[in-house]
UniProtKB/Swiss-Prot annotation:
Gene Ontology cellular component list: cilium; cytoplasm; Golgi apparatus; Golgi membrane; intraciliary transport particle B; sperm flagellum
Record's subcellular location: Cell projection, Cilium; Cytoplasm; Cell projection, Cilium, Flagellum
Protein name from the UniProt record: Intraflagellar transport protein 27 homolog
Family: Belongs to the small GTPase superfamily. Rab family.
Gene assigned in the entry: IFT27
Originating species: Bos taurus (Bovine)
Origin: domain of life: Eukaryota
Entry-linked InterPro entries: P-loop_NTPase, Rab_GTPases_membrane_traffic, RabL4_euk, Small_GTP-bd, Small_GTPase
Binding site for GTP: 12-19, 64-68, 123-126
Keyword tags: Cell projection, Cilium, Cytoplasm, Differentiation, Flagellum, GTP-binding, Nucleotide-binding, Protein transport, Spermatogenesis, Transport
Subunit structure: Component of the IFT complex B, at least composed of IFT20, IFT22, IFT25, IFT27, IFT46, IFT52, TRAF3IP1/IFT54, IFT57, IFT74, IFT80, IFT81, and IFT88. Interacts with IFT25. Interacts with IFT70B. Interacts with RABL2/RABL2A; binding is equal in the presence of GTP or GDP. Interacts with IFT88. Interacts with ARL6; recognizes and binds with the GTP-free form of ARL6.
PROSITE patterns on file: RAB (PS51419)
Keyword Protein transport: yes
Biological processes annotated in GO: cell differentiation; intracellular protein transport; intraciliary transport; kidney development; smoothened signaling pathway; spermatogenesis; vesicle-mediated transport
Length: 186
């Protein structure tokens, strides 16, 4: 049984639900943050995720970073060497989706020339009447960027675990590939 540790960057614009998503995931659905508070730096959420059919697990160190541009300079150091990326946007806010390109570019610049497994998460699907970002549009963009696409409603506690389980599985897969290469060299 192997226990791996992965640094996960949680990125996206303010008010898209990054903190609520991380907190709900950490608490296994027991805690939904009803009052909004602006993240002004980085909150760290740690949770161990079992990798199916392996007996192994990945401890995700989720860096929940401020979505405000003015805070982004101080985050550069904290964003160094990420292992996985979770981009979050609000399905009712077109600009938050558009800005995912900026967040992705920033994250990838931290590890040039290296694969960064990632997911694109459309949050607030409970606000279906106000939706402006189409599922197909998000899926097409994610596919073009090499990301897996998910939708969730943190408020309704729907599908909030799936992105993190996917990231843990992808990180474990990369570990197994590197291990096989190393063993072939020995």
């Amino acid at each position: 049984m192997v226990k791996l540790a992965a640094k996960c960057i949680l990125a996206g614009d303010p008010t898209v639900g990054k903190t609520a998503l991380a907190q709900l995931f950490r608490s296994d659905g027991a805690h939904f943050q009803k009052n909004y508070t602006l993240t002004t730096g980085v909150d760290l959420v740690v949770k161990t995720v079992p990798v199916p059919d392996t007996g192994d697990s990945v401890e995700l160190f989720i860096f929940d970073s401020a979505g405000k541009e003015l805070f982004s300079e101080m985050l550069d150091k904290l964003w160094e060497s990420p292992n996985v990326l979770c981009l979050v946007y609000d399905v009712t806010n077109e600009q938050s989706f558009t800005n995912c390109s900026k967040w992705l570019e920033k994250a990838r610049s931290q590890i040039p020339g290296t694969t960064l497994p990632g997911v694109l998460v459309g949050n607030k699907t409970d606000l279906a009447g106000r939706r402006v970002v189409d599922v197909a549009q998000a899926q097409a963009w994610a596919l073009g960027q090499g990301l897996e696409c998910f939708e969730t409603s943190v408020k309704e506690m729907e599908n909030y675990e799936a992105p993190f389980h996917y990231l843990a599985k992808q990180f474990h897969h990369l570990y197994r590939e590197k291990l096989e290469v190393f063993q072939a060299l020995v």
